[in-house]
């Protein structure tokens, strides 16, 4: 069984604990009942305990449940996966189409190694087939680049040239909180702010690399970015209040007239 469930923000009763920890516990129990021989879990590259981020900590707790399950397993600690509908190319593209200024995280550049979704799927298949000997491995893309360079590359493919403004990490965390409160899908979630502040290129704690023949080889190039570009930009429909108002109007329209 492949276990990829996860959230990057909490919504109502969909908390990090319920989705990451309780959800993983349920997968393990179901695997035992049905005689599943292998669990492949997709985790996060820097999931770890005691780091101050509920996302990272609950992902780590889920990893530990799998490790202690007694079932043969492979834990894939993956970095930033991109493709249509992602939270990287999608959100950056819509942001640079909407605003003339783009905020970059911190005054010291962090790095990222983006993984195209098709290569992430290939790694999942290899893990299911037992071709990855280590029980825990790091999964990162072939190309390492600074986050600012990745953003500029996306903006270039999207045909935009915004002004880039470095802002302190605390400001990105504040932006994340505000957009979680106000947007249906936030521009950046608090968990993602932590990821951007740290960079997404090195595993923490250490995990070995994939076998050479399974490692991603595709660069973060124009063709792959273009394939992941979304339509449109951010608008009023992305706001929670607009969604609420539309729901109220539908409700009123459905009521019988007197």
Residue ranges with predicted function:
Residues 127-189, 202-258:
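Mid/C-terminal beta-alpha module of Rossmann-like enzyme folds, strongest
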Residues 26, 87-88, 107-129, 135-138:
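Substrate-positioning beta->alpha
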Residues 1-26, 30-33, 45-49:
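NAD(P)H-binding glycine-rich loop region in Rossmannoid oxidoreductase-like domains
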Residues 64-85, 91, 98:
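Conserved beta-loop-beta element that borders a ligand/cofactor-binding pocket
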Residues 17-21, 40, 59:
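Short alpha-helix in the Rossmann-fold core of NAD(P)-dependent oxidoreductases
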Residues 23-26, 38, 61-62, 116-119:
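Conserved cofactor-binding/catalytic machinery of classical short-chain dehydrogenase/reductase
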Residues 10, 45-57, 81-86:
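Conserved catalytic-site region of short-chain dehydrogenase/reductase
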